[in-house]
């Protein structure tokens, strides 16, 4: 099935960034976070509440929609971990 539509306010990039805490823990993750939120917004604008507005578009499928919403939950954790690892590694040289 198609995941719940976050609502016209919920798909806004600024709302997404706030919800994910973009850059709050780690400024280096801000760029990745912003890019993700913009992509997510475009996805929802294109695909709508149930993918119907993107007829024939391969991007509007439930698997991708679920992946987008799942990614928003895991993205920042992963980014922060990666950044921390890079900083740690860079400091060793």
From Swiss-Prot:
GO terms for cellular component: extracellular region. Its main location: secreted. It is found in: Secreted. Keywords: Cytolysis, Disulfide bond, Hemolysis, Secreted, Toxin. GO terms for biological process: killing of cells of another organism. Disulfide bonds join 16-37, 22-33. Localized within the skin and proboscis and are most readily isolated from body mucus secretions. The keyword Secreted applies. Belongs to the worm cytolysin family. Cytolysin that shows hemolytic activity (on bovine erythrocytes, HC(50)=5.75 mg/ml). This hemolytic activity is completely inhibited by small unilamelar vesicles composed of PC/PG, PC/PI and PC/PS in 1:1 molar ratios (with at least 100 mg/ml concentration). This is Parbolysin P2. It comes from Parborlasia corrugatus (Antarctic nemertean worm).
